[in-house]
UniProtKB/Swiss-Prot annotation:
The keyword Transport does not apply. Homodimer. It holds the Pfam family HGTP_anticodon. Disulfide bonds: none annotated. The gene is proS. CDD domains: ProRS_core_arch_euk. This is Proline--tRNA ligase. Signal peptide: none annotated.
Length: 461
């Protein structure tokens, strides 16, 4: 089955997302999918909270004159903005944009709050819906007109040095987040022609899907003083002078959820990382006539023990065990525990891992420790397996000549022969938009790989 078909099918079968809402590019998180989203963003929230970020919530509506204040910024997506033009039947004097992103909203308010150097640093974030009128082919959780889960952080600092340190911290936070959901990434400094509008530079996190295409799943932007000058975000320095704040912003969206679905899944269904699984353990009683009660009591006992640490579900439906196994494999539950009369007699339990199908018989009295050990290995194994997959999608080609046309043909041939990311040793003379136009692919930017600097190239979503 082609990846595209598998992806669309698993979103429905596993109860993740329903795209039948009557607006293109808008869908509904189903309860199971919403829990994956919730647990994922809880990890991200904790990482931000632990580094002194404060969560907040800003309005969705942005006045046209405020959005237009940052000219270079709005040029990056002015054709994608949704506009509110009426209140009821009455035309509005000033059109209101549905939030495409929140720089203009947040920086207008930061100006009200930041007066002196002691007000800095200010590190805010929110998780909100954003809207873009995507004209390309929309795909659930990948390319949406309503992005339902956009975590955007915005910071302001008194010095350029503090601003640069914040960029490093943001990259570390995102690195830890993607490790937690077992997603390997390639980090690139985006080229000048593809950086965030209004930024000094952009760092981006990309991963590779099973079809070999690359997807951007996180960005970190150094804004310098560009937005601060536009919004007159000034503060009084320790020596009594005035200066503009130095700013950063960084975002992660529903694409993080799409990535963990796509990268870990297999022909049976989802394979969910431990920490974001709505159900971490499913208990399945194996019932035999005349011994139902003893099995049910044991299942209840184990469930009570396991629920002290994990999210547990007992599947007591009156259907065959094989059907239950299949259902929970589709949903990607990390661990299945089976208990039958013989297991009870022997003081055992059978545990089955979703990531590799390994079946183990363990001592029932020690079930909590056995599960903990299994989960530690599961998490490490899932990240290692995903990393090995990503490495197979990386091709390094030598650049012994500086001829633009010859190199572009070499890159195009490499892309036709292998999916994923092509790495070309960096040469300043070929790192430009003209080169990108010749290769029928995207230049992701400058990437450090095995200690060397490369131009990274890929076909993208």
């Amino acid at each position: 089955m082609e990846f595209s078909e598998w992806y669309s099918e698993i979103l429905e079968k596993a109860g993740i997302y329903d795209l039948r809402y009557p607006i293109k590019g808008c869908g509904v998180y189903l309860p199971y999918g919403f829990k994956i989203r919730r647990y994922s963003f809880e990890i991200l929230r904790k990482l931000l909270d632990d580094t002194n970020h404060d969560e907040t919530l800003f309005p969705m509506l942005i006045p046209e004159n405020l959005l237009a204040k940052e000219g270079e910024h709005i040029k990056g997506f002015e054709d994608e903005v949704y506009w509110v033009t009426h209140g009821g039947k009455s035309p509005l004097e000033i059109k209101l944009a549905l939030r495409p992103t929140s720089e203009t909203t947040m920086y207008y308010m930061m100006k009200q709050w930041i007066k002196v150097h002691t007000d800095l640093p200010m590190k805010l974030y929110q998780v909100v819906n954003t809207f873009r009128y995507e004209t390309k082919h929309t795909r659930p959780l990948i390319r949406l007109r309503e992005i339902m889960s956009f975590k955007e952080a915005h910071t302001a600092h008194s010095t350029q040095d503090d601003c640069n340190k914040q960029i490093k911290e943001a990259i570390e936070i995102y690195g830890k987040f993607f490790d937690e959901i077992c997603i390997p990434v390639i980090i690139s400094k985006r080229p000048e022609w593809d950086k965030f509008p209004g930024a000094d530079y952009t760092m981006a996190f990309d991963t590779i899907f099973p079809d070999g295409k690359t997807m951007q799943i996180g960005t970190v932007h150094n804004l310098g003083q560009n937005f601060a000058k536009t919004f007159e975000l000034e503060f009084e320095t320790p020596d009594g002078n005035k200066d503009y704040a130095y700013q950063t912003c960084y975002g992660i969206s529903d694409r993080a959820i799409a990535s963990l679905i796509a990268i870990h899944g297999d022909e049976k269904g989802l394979v969910i990382p431990i920490d974001v699984a709505p159900i971490q353990i499913v208990l399945i009683p194996l019932l035999f006539k005349g011994k139902e009660e003893i099995v049910i009591e044991k299942i209840k006992e184990l469930s009570k023990i396991l629920k002290t640490k994990y999210r547990v579900h007992v599947d007591d439906r009156d259907i065959r065990p094989g059907r239950k196994y299949n259902d929970w494999e589709i949903k990607g539950v990390p661990l299945r525990i089976e208990i039958g009369p013989r297991d009870i007699e022997e003081g055992k339990a059978v545990i089955v891992r979703r990531d590799n199908g390994q079946k183990m018989t363990v001592e029932a009295f020690n079930i909590l420790n056995e599960v903990e050990k299994t989960f530690e290995d599961y998490k490490a194994s899932l990240l290692q397996k995903a990393t090995e997959k990503l490495e197979k999608y990386i091709t390094v080609i030598e650049n012994d000549k500086k001829d633009l046309l010859l190199l572009s043909e070499k890159v195009k041939f490499a892309l036709s022969e292998s999916k994923g990311i092509i790495l070309v040793p960096y040469i300043e003379s070929i790192y430009n938009e003209e080169f990108e136009g010749l290769i029928d692919a995207s230049v992701l930017g400058l990437t450090t790989y095995n200690g060397k600097e490369y131009i990274s190239i890929a076909r993208t979503y």
